[in-house]
C-alpha cells in the first residue's frame, strides 16, 4: 500500500489516511491505529465479563465470575448446606484433638464458633426459601497466643475438616489504599485462587490473618501522624470483616479506576485473626492492679509465659484498645480465644501423637529408603527440651530434627547394608552419629575380623 494514496480509508471508522497516524492494510480492508486501540479496550473488558470466556493472556490468572468456571469441564454444582451436614462442636473438637496438642479451651471456643457460623449459612439458605427475615450476624475469631503455639494450625485443621477454601494472609504486608504495599482486597484474591477462582465457593471459605497485632496503632493519639500500616489497615479491614461487596483486582496489586474487578461478598467468609500480642499481659495486669509478672506468685512453679497466659484470660476489650486496636475493629471480633504456651510435655506429645507428627513424617521418609527409623523416648524428650529453650514453640522442633537427621539422610540413601537406624539422647545432645543396624550379609565374619 502506498502511503501517498489519499483515497484509502479505514474500513471501520471511515477516516482517511491523513486523519490517522497509521493505516494497516489487509486483504481488501484497512484498519487505523485508533480502531486497533478501541478493539484492545473491548477485548480487555470482555476478558472478565460474565458473558464471555476468552483465553487469558499468558501469565495472567484465569477470569473468574459468578457465571463461569476457571477450570476445564463443567462447573461444579453449588453445594447446599444442611444442618445435618455440619459437624457438631464435640465432633469438631475431637477432630482438632487428633491434629493439635493441648489448647483445650481454645478448641472448645473455636468448635462452637465455627459450628454456629456454618449453622448460620445453613439457616440463610433455608430462610431464603421460607421467606424468613431474621438475619444472624457472623462472629469472627481473634486468637491470642505466643509464637509456635498452634494458631495457624488450628485454622488450617478447621478448614480441612469443613472442606472449605482456606487462605492465610500476613497483616504486616498490608497498607492503607494509596500507599506502597498490599491492599486488603488482595487477601480475598488469595482465597479466590485457593477456590480455583470459584466465587461461590470462596464466599463460604475461611481466611486466617496472621500477625494481626502488628497493625496496632503506633500512637495513642491518632492525629500525630498518618499510620498507613497500623490504624489505616484496621480501618480498611472493617467493612470486609463485617460483610461487604469487595472489588478484588483479578491480577492482584493496586486497583485503578479503569480496571475491571471481581466482586466478592464477604458476609459469609469467616475471618480468624491471630497474633502474639507481646506486652498485652502487662496492660491487663496493670488494670487488675496486680504485680504477678516478675514477682513471687502463688503458682511459682509456672513459667513466665504460663503466668502471662493466665493473666490474659482476664483480658477485656479496653486492654486491646490500649494495646493499639481501634474499638470498631475489636467489635468485629466478638470471639476471643487465648492459647497457652507449649511446655516440654506438650512439645514431647507434638513429636509423636498427632496423625502427622514430626517423628512419623521422618519415619515415612526413611521407610522409602528401606530403613526403619526409631526415636528413643529419651531422645524425644531431649528434642523437646531443646525446643523449649529456644522459646519459639513447636516451630523449633523441625529445625532441631533436621539438624539431627542431616547426616543420616545424607548417608543412608546410598547404603544398601543398613536396615535400622536409632536416634538416641546422646545424638540429640552431642550431635553424635546414629546407631545403625547392618544386614546380616554385611556383618564382618570372625575370620575377617
UniProtKB/Swiss-Prot annotation:
Stretches the record annotates as Disordered: 49-82
Molecular function (GO) terms for this protein are:
ATP binding; ATP hydrolysis activity; ATP-dependent protein folding chaperone; protein dimerization activity; unfolded protein binding; zinc ion binding
**Keyword match Membrane:** no
The source's domain of life comes to: Bacteria
Q: What keywords is this UniProt entry annotated with?
A: ATP-binding, Chaperone, Metal-binding, Nucleotide-binding, Zinc
Q: Where is the ClpX-type ZB domain?
A: 1-51
Q: Which residues does Zn(2+) bind?
A: 10, 13, 32, 35
GO CC terms: HslUV protease complex
GO biological-process terms attached to the record: cell division; proteolysis involved in protein catabolic process
Residues the record lists as binding ATP: 146-153
A Pfam family matched in the record: ClpB_D2-small
Q: Which InterPro entries match?
A: AAA+_ATPase, ATP-dep_Clp_protease_ClpX, ATPase_AAA_core, Clp_ATPase_C, Clp_protease_ATP-bd_su_ClpX, ClpX_bact, P-loop_NTPase, Znf_CppX_C4
The answer to whether the entry has keyword Chaperone is yes
Q: Which CDD domains match?
A: RecA-like_ClpX
As for family, the record states: Belongs to the ClpX chaperone family.
What is the role of this chain? ATP-dependent specificity component of the Clp protease. It directs the protease to specific substrates. Can perform chaperone functions in the absence of ClpP.
Query: Subunit structure, per the record?
Result: Component of the ClpX-ClpP complex. Forms a hexameric ring that, in the presence of ATP, binds to fourteen ClpP subunits assembled into a disk-like structure with a central cavity, resembling the structure of eukaryotic proteasomes.
Record-given protein name: ATP-dependent Clp protease ATP-binding subunit ClpX
Q: Native species of this protein?
A: Synechococcus elongatus (strain ATCC 33912 / PCC 7942 / FACHB-805)
* Gene name for this UniProt entry: clpX
Amino acid at each position: 500500500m502506498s502511503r501517498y494514496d489519499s483515497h484509502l480509508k479505514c474500513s471501520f471508522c471511515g477516516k482517511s489516511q491523513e486523519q490517522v497516524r497509521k493505516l494497516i492494510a489487509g486483504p481488501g480492508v484497512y484498519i487505523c491505529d485508533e480502531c486497533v486501540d478501541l478493539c484492545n479496550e473491548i477485548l480487555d473488558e470482555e476478558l472478565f465479563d460474565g458473558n464471555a470466556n476468552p483465553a487469558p493472556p499468558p501469565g495472567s490468572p484465569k477470569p473468574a465470575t459468578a457465571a463461569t468456571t476457571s477450570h476445564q469441564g463443567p462447573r461444579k454444582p453449588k453445594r447446599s448446606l444442611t444442618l445435618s451436614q455440619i459437624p457438631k462442636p464435640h465432633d469438631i473438637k475431637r477432630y482438632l484433638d487428633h491434629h493439635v496438642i493441648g489448647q483445650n479451651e481454645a478448641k472448645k471456643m473455636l468448635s462452637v464458633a465455627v459450628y454456629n457460623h456454618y449453622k448460620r449459612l445453613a439457616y440463610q439458605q433455608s430462610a431464603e426459601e421460607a421467606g424468613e427475615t431474621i438475619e444472624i450476624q457472623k462472629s469472627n475469631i481473634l486468637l491470642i497466643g505466643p509464637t509456635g503455639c498452634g494458631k495457624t494450625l488450628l485454622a488450617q485443621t478447621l478448614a480441612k475438616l469443613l472442606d472449605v477454601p482456606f487462605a492465610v494472609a500476613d497483616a504486616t504486608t498490608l497498607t492503607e489504599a494509596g500507599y506502597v504495599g498490599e491492599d486488603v482486597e488482595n487477601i480475598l484474591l488469595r482465597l479466590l485462587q485457593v477456590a480455583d477462582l470459584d466465587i461461590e465457593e470462596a464466599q463460604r471459605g475461611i481466611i486466617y490473618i496472621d500477625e494481626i497485632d502488628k497493625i496496632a496503632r503506633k500512637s495513642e493519639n491518632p492525629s500525630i501522624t498518618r499510620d498507613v500500616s497500623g490504624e489505616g489497615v484496621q480501618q480498611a479491614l472493617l467493612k470486609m470483616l463485617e460483610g461487604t461487596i469487595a472489588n478484588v483486582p483479578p491480577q492482584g496489586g493496586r486497583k485503578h479506576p479503569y480496571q475491571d474487578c471481581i466482586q466478592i461478598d464477604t458476609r459469609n467468609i469467616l475471618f480468624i485473626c491471630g497474633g502474639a500480642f507481646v506486652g498485652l499481659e502487662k496492660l491487663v495486669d496493670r488494670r487488675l492492679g496486680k504485680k504477678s509478672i516478675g514477682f513471687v506468685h502463688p503458682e511459682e512453679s509456672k513459667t513466665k509465659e504460663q503466668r502471662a497466659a493466665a493473666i490474659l484470660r482476664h483480658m477485656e476489650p479496653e486492654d486491646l484498645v490500649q494495646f493499639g486496636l481501634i474499638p470498631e475493629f475489636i467489635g468485629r471480633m466478638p470471639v476471643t480465644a487465648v492459647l497457652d504456651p507449649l511446655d516440654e510435655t506438650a512439645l514431647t506429645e507434638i513429636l509423636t501423637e498427632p496423625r502427622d507428627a514430626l517423628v512419623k513424617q521422618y519415619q515415612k521418609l526413611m521407610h522409602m529408603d528401606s530403613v526403619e527409623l526409631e526415636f528413643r523416648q529419651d531422645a524425644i524428650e531431649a528434642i523437646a527440651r531443646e525446643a523449649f529453650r529456644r522459646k519459639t514453640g513447636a516451630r523449633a522442633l523441625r529445625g532441631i530434627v533436621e539438624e539431627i537427621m542431616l547426616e543420616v539422610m545424607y548417608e543412608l540413601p546410598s547404603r544398601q547394608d543398613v536396615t535400622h537406624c536409632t536416634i538416641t539422647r546422646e545424638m540429640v545432645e552431642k550431635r553424635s552419629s546414629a546407631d545403625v543396624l547392618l544386614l546380616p550379609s554385611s556383618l564382618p565374619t570372625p575370620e575377617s575380623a
